[in-house]
UniProtKB/Swiss-Prot annotation:
GO cellular component, one term: glycosylphosphatidylinositol-N-acetylglucosaminyltransferase (GPI-GnT) complex
Regions that span the bilayer: 106-126, 133-153, 159-179, 194-214, 222-242, 245-265, 276-296, 301-321
Enzyme class: transferase
Species assigned in the record: Dictyostelium discoideum
Lineage: Eukaryota, Amoebozoa, Evosea, Eumycetozoa, Dictyostelia
Name the UniProt record assigns to this protein: Putative phosphatidylinositol N-acetylglucosaminyltransferase subunit C
């Protein structure tokens, strides 16, 4: 009886332990499954991070470079968004002021007026409306007054001594006087129409190639060989139409004073005083207008129209078209070599 009872207790304990183990095994299984899932997720995240790093490295390696010597995975006509990163527009842009441009245009008006005054002197010499002594006195007076005026308005200028200057003047005009007979007959065989046409072309060339920057004080050395030679040659052509050697000498003397010496005088005058520069322009234009009016009203009107256009219309036009200026600079430009003094070659 006791043995039967003991066996029954053992069987109950075994069943209890079996049921206990059966009830706890699903929990353990769930824990193991969750651990496995977490491990897989971590592995996937690591793989994604590695893929992102690889993509970033590939993007860095494949980034477009402005190199012609390196092969890149881009088409020949590909334009990257960083291509124009170094573009600079209108870096040297200078906004012009109307009255400043007008004052600078006076230099052109003065030169045109000087050419016309020279032609007027030739016309009066040809028609004998001005006497020869008056022409000689006027040429000598202009030379002396101009030399004295430069000394007064610009004492710092580097001039030769008075004695040396007069020696140079005597030598120059003495040479012209000695060559006057040759110059008078040099083109004597040319027809009048040829002389007028060649003179007109040469005087136009003189105006186009004149050194206007020197008169406007943009340079300190008068350099206009083509312009000066064209004007002197034009005076030689006109001299062949005059009646005497003295007339030729006076005309070429005027040419030297007008085309070689007068720009130097105007350069020093403007550097000394802008008011004197404006006053000289007004005097020249008024004198030329009155002289042309005595010859022909049409010529006077044409002259006034040309001077008015150059002085007022052209500056307005220049300022108007400034808004269309588009100067492009960038790293593709040629390198500028800078000298030790700071200027560019």
């Amino acid at each position: 009886m006791n043995d039967h009872h003991l066996n029954h207790r053992i069987i109950n304990n075994i069943n209890a332990s079996s049921s206990s183990s059966s009830s706890s095994s699903p929990v353990q299984t769930n824990i193991n499954i969750n651990s496995a899932n977490n491990t897989n997720n971590n592995n996937n995240n690591n793989n994604n991070n590695n893929n992102n790093n690889n993509n970033n490295n590939n993007n860095i390696d494949n980034k477009w470079k402005k190199n012609l010597y390196e092969k890149q995975p881009y088409s020949d006509n590909y334009t990257d968004e960083t291509f124009l990163i170094g573009l600079v527009q209108n870096a040297n842009f200078i906004k012009y002021d109307f009255w400043t441009v007008v004052l600078d245009s006076f230099t052109v008006s003065q030169q045109i007026t000087s050419v016309i005054l020279f032609a007027i002197i030739f016309f009066h010499s040809l028609k004998h409306t001005l006497t020869l002594p008056f022409l000689v006195a006027m040429a000598g007076g202009f030379l002396v007054l101009g030399y004295i005026a430069i000394i007064i308005i610009d004492p710092s200028a580097n001039f030769l001594s008075i004695r040396s200057s007069f020696l140079h003047i005597i030598l120059l005009f003495g040479t012209v006087y000695g060559l006057s007979p040759v110059l008078r007959t040099l083109t004597n065989s040319f027809s009048d129409d040829t002389i007028w046409a060649l003179t007109f072309i040469l005087l136009l060339a003189h105006l186009f190639f004149h050194d206007y920057g020197y008169t406007n004080n943009e340079s300190q050395k008068f350099s206009a060989p083509v312009s000066l030679n064209a004007a002197i040659f034009a005076s030689v052509l006109l001299g062949s139409r005059l009646p005497s050697n003295i007339h030729v000498f006076v005309l070429i003397s005027y040419a030297i004073e007008t085309f070689a010496l007068f720009p130097i005088f105007r350069h020093h005058l403007k550097r000394h005083s802008m008011e004197l520069h404006v006053g000289l322009t007004v005097i020249l234009c008024v004198t030329c207008s009155l002289l042309l009016l005595g010859m022909s009203k049409l010529l006077a009107l044409i002259y006034i129209g040309i001077i008015g256009t150059i002085t007022f219309v052209c500056p307005l036009w220049l300022i108007f078209i400034q808004k269309y200026k588009n100067e492009i600079n960038g790293p593709w430009d040629e390198a500028s070599v800078i000298s030790q003094s700071g200027g560019e070659f």
